[in-house]
Structures are given as structure tokens and as C-alpha cells.
From Swiss-Prot:
Organism of this sequence: Geotalea daltonii (strain DSM 22248 / JCM 15807 / FRC-32)
InterPro entries: DUF520, UPF0234-like_C, UPF0234_N, YajQ-like_sf
Signal peptide location: none
Function: Nucleotide-binding protein.
Keyword Nucleotide-binding (UniProt): yes
UniProt protein name: Nucleotide-binding protein Geob_0921
A single GO cellular-component term on record: cytosol
CDD domains, A to Z: YajQ_like (cd11740)
Record keywords, A-Z: Nucleotide-binding
């Protein structure tokens, strides 16, 4: 029976490269000269610490452009709220999403069931497996999910016949 898996994975080496490129650009930019701005990568989170909201937005723009250049979708980033840190600094934590959460898995299941195609979908840990008798139905599901904005960067892997 043909099947495929829906996953949302990010290559952490590419994330590390993008963060390092952003740090280099921040160090060289004229509008950041003499300012205390930090961007650090810790496991699945990027921490941004800087002096004001203007610089924070500029750093986030730099990060997003570096992510896009490295082939990482901006949907993989989940922004925390802006917090005041000590010494009139502002901090924001940006989480890098790995895997499909249970809630998003249920949402994907509902989207697939609404199509009335003869396919079954089931949530397995951090992925969703879709099986069906007809390969064309599975390809229709892939096209449908690519067209929907679910707030995740979805990849379709393990396409088996």
C-alpha cells in the first residue's frame, strides 16, 4: 500500500551557519557600531539581546535573510515575546521548530479528511503518515497541503509504493 510521511525538520547545521553569518554581518554594519548586540544559538533556540526595539527588528531582518539564503523556511522560526532585560536592553527568544506537534498533526488530519479522498492519516510522534491505495490520491494530498498555509515548513518523505 503506497504511503508517505509528512515531517517538519530543519538542518541545525544550516541554522548554525545562518546565525554565524548574521553575527558577522552585525559586527560589520555601521548602524551597529558601538552597540551591545548579541545573537546566540542554544540547542533549538536563538537568543537575541540588544539595546532597543529598532536594533532588535534589524537583527531579526538580518537573521531572516540569512535563513532564506541558506534554504531554511521562515516558517520554521517561532518568535517569543520581546522582554526587557537588565540595563535598558531588550531580549527575544526565537524557537526553531522541529517536528509536527500533536495539535498541528490533528489540523493536518482534518484537512486531509475534508478532501474525502480514499486515504488514511495517522499521527506518529513528530510526523504524520498518510496511506492510500491509489498513488494519485496521495499526490493530490501533497498538492493540497503545499497549497495550505499551516504555519509549518512541511516536507514529504519516505514515499513508498
Amino acid at each position: 500500500m503506497p504511503s508517505f510521511d509528512i515531517v517538519s525538520k530543519v538542518d541545525m547545521q544550516e541554522v548554525d551557519n545562518a546565525v554565524n553569518q548574521a553575527v558577522k554581518e552585525i559586527a560589520q554594519r555601521y548602524d551597529f557600531k558601538g552597540s551591545k548586540s548579541e545573537v546566540t544559538l542554544e540547542k533549538d533556540a536563538i537568543k537575541v539581546l540588544t539595546e532597543d526595539d529598532f536594533r532588535l527588528k534589524a537583527i531579526i531582518d538580518i537573521l531572516q535573510s540569512k535563513f532564506i539564503k541558506r534554504g531554511i523556511s521562515a516558517k520554521a522560526l517561532q518568535y517569543g515575546k520581546v522582554e526587557n532585560a537588565s540595563g535598558s536592553m531588550v531580549r527575544q527568544v526565537i524557537d526553531v521548530q522541529q517536528g509536527v506537534s500533536k495539535e498541528k498533526g490533528k489540523e493536518i488530519n482534518n484537512v486531509i479528511k475534508e478532501t474525502k479522498l480514499k486515504v488514511q492519516s495517522q499521527i506518529q510522534d513528530d510526523q504524520v503518515r498518510v496511506t492510500g491505495k491509489n498513488i494519485d490520491d496521495l499526490q493530490q494530498v501533497i498538492q493540497l497541503l503545499k497549497g495550505k498555509d499551516l504555519g509549518l515548513d512541511l516536507q514529504f518523505v519516505n514515499f513508498r509504493q
